[in-house]
Amino acid sequence: MSSQPFTNKVIALTGSASGIGLETAKLLASRGARLSLADIQEDKLKELQAQLESEYYVDVITTKVDVRKFGEVEAWINKTIDNFGKLDGSANLAGVAPESIGLKGIVEQDLDEWEFVLGVNLTGTMNSLKAQLKVMANNGSIVNASSIRGLTGAAKNASYSSAKHGIIGLTRTAAKEVGGKGIRVNAICPGRISTPMLKTAENSIGLHLQPGSANYPPIALGRDGEAKEVAQLVAFLLSDESTYISGADISIDGGWRC
């Protein structure tokens, strides 16, 4: 396999400024992709752009986007087409966890928090798909970020789990709609991945799980995953090595659900 399998491929990413999105941007740049990066954190995007351009000599554009707002998402994708002339793939990785995760059940659910979490995670993914599929090249590929919580229930995690379940349904629906164009749409379902979002969630409840501790989840590999490991899966699904995979929800959880 070529060390630059994404040469001349244009890939759009949300959630690019941190965590899985950041590592995915780095990996794709190292493999020759031309990138259109979106995130709400504009300063971090600019820092990443400078790093990728200097280290990998690839074309990168960045856009501050609130994925809850379709107008902003559509403007970003239009900017991508204006700059690069096409869109070969996208990874919709923007996501948030609720501050009340692990603390409040459904009876105590705050409606503003519910709307925010579903807005970023689920509506944000729908907005991204809506804009991307209008211009996606035939035989393109899209990866959406679900979660292990999109496959299983979890007490005191209603908004996040509901959003991530919804992303799987949205992914399957999109795959059925655009398969005739050769466009593939898949969802990844990460487990415990060492990211800023995981740290923030654990800080909010004052609980820091360590491998080997009594309350650590039953993960077969006995450790948290790294964001760069998830990036490898995203890159695989965007690549020509996965041309018969579509409508799938693929776990990357170290053997948590097995």
Curated annotation (Swiss-Prot):
<dbReference type="InterPro" id="IPR020904">
    <property type="entry name" value="Sc_DH/Rdtase_CS"/>
</dbReference>
<comment type="similarity">
    <text>Belongs to the short-chain dehydrogenases/reductases (SDR) family.</text>
</comment>
<feature type="active site" description="Lowers pKa of active site Tyr">
    <location>
        <position position="164"/>
    </location>
</feature>
<feature type="binding site">
    <location>
        <position position="164"/>
    </location>
    <ligand>
        <name>NADP(+)</name>
    </ligand>
</feature>
<dbReference type="GO" id="GO:0009688">
    <property type="term" value="P:abscisic acid biosynthetic process"/>
</dbReference>
<dbReference type="InterPro" id="IPR036291">
    <property type="entry name" value="NAD(P)-bd_dom_sf"/>
</dbReference>
<dbReference type="GO" id="GO:0016491">
    <property type="term" value="F:oxidoreductase activity"/>
</dbReference>
<feature type="binding site">
    <location>
        <position position="193"/>
    </location>
    <ligand>
        <name>NADP(+)</name>
    </ligand>
</feature>
<comment type="function">
    <text>Short-chain dehydrogenase/reductase; part of the gene cluster that mediates the biosynthesis of abscisic acid (ABA), a phytohormone that acts antagonistically toward salicylic acid (SA), jasmonic acid (JA) and ethylene (ETH) signaling, to impede plant defense responses. The first step of the pathway catalyzes the reaction from farnesyl diphosphate to alpha-ionylideneethane performed by the alpha-ionylideneethane synthase aba3 via a three-step reaction mechanism involving 2 neutral intermediates, beta-farnesene and allofarnesene.</text>
</comment>
<dbReference type="InterPro" id="IPR002347">
    <property type="entry name" value="SDR_fam"/>
</dbReference>
<protein>
    <recommendedName>
        <fullName>Short-chain dehydrogenase/reductase aba4</fullName>
        <ecNumber>1.1.1.-</ecNumber>
    </recommendedName>
</protein>
<keyword id="KW-0560">Oxidoreductase</keyword>
<feature type="active site" description="Proton donor">
    <location>
        <position position="160"/>
    </location>
</feature>
<feature type="binding site">
    <location>
        <position position="20"/>
    </location>
    <ligand>
        <name>NADP(+)</name>
    </ligand>
</feature>
<keyword id="KW-0843">Virulence</keyword>
<comment type="pathway">
    <text>Hormone biosynthesis.</text>
</comment>
<feature type="active site" description="Proton donor">
    <location>
        <position position="146"/>
    </location>
</feature>
<feature type="binding site">
    <location>
        <position position="160"/>
    </location>
    <ligand>
        <name>NADP(+)</name>
    </ligand>
</feature>
<dbReference type="Pfam" id="PF13561">
    <property type="entry name" value="adh_short_C2"/>
</dbReference>
<keyword id="KW-0521">NADP</keyword>
<feature type="binding site">
    <location>
        <position position="66"/>
    </location>
    <ligand>
        <name>NADP(+)</name>
    </ligand>
</feature>
<feature type="binding site">
    <location>
        <position position="130"/>
    </location>
    <ligand>
        <name>NADP(+)</name>
    </ligand>
</feature>
<feature type="binding site">
    <location>
        <position position="195"/>
    </location>
    <ligand>
        <name>NADP(+)</name>
    </ligand>
</feature>
